[in-house]
Amino acid sequence: MTNYREIAWQGLWKNNPGLVQLLGLCPLLAVTATLTNALGLGVATMLVLIGSNILVSLVRDYVPKEIRIPVFVMIIAALVTAVQLLINAYAYGLYLSLGIFLPLIVTNCIIIGRAEAFASRNNAFSAAFDGLMMGLGFTLVLAVLGATREILGQGTLFDGADQLLGPWAKALTIQVWQVDTPFLLAMLPPGAFIVMGLLIALKNVIDKKLKERQPEVAVQPSVTRARITKVS
């Protein structure tokens, strides 16, 4: 029986693809200069994850093991193309901001990894839920990283939200503080590496505190039984 609570815990925290597995670092560090870009890439990746997991789960019994990886990549590429066309049609500004990193979702190790490790061994519903949780976990890391970099670099939050949600979303832009000169370190990839390292360190500290709160289980010493044979 599938443990959906464990799947959610793995995707959102314990085995988070961004903070623990450190997968998809190239787009994660390059695109997250603003919260809007981070959410756009995160949602696109999550949609591809869910779709690819479902399709891989449905065809897993019909694809020979020898060619499963090329088939999985073709499925992922088709879904990425569909998502790319949708963003191009309905969020052209975001499409331009994401640039080459949108089609590069095809090569994201998170997606092919979940297809191989989980979707190819479980039913479609469980695979879809796993894709949703892994996608949400990745999107949350992107969002926190993007929000932190945007606040430090520009002093704003949700700048350019109209690229993702339409003209009405311009009202969502928040001016946290007035910045005369942008803080370039936070907006460039080196700053992304620093913030990412701090997020990983924070997660490790939280995990350590949670582990210390758990009651220790007493380990019973093993008893070795000696066999005595009569010596004549």
Swiss-Prot record:
It is found in: Cell inner membrane. It comes from the Bacteria. One of its GO terms (cellular component) is plasma membrane. One of its GO terms (biological process) is electron transport chain. It is a multi-pass membrane protein. Coiled coil: none annotated. The chain crosses the membrane at residues 18-38, 39-59, 69-89, 93-113, 127-147, 182-202. HAMAP family: RsxE_RnfE. NCBIfam families: PRK12405.1 (NF009070), rnfE (TIGR01948). Belongs to the NqrDE/RnfAE family. This is Ion-translocating oxidoreductase complex subunit E. The lineage of its organism: Bacteria, Pseudomonadati, Pseudomonadota, Gammaproteobacteria, Alteromonadales.
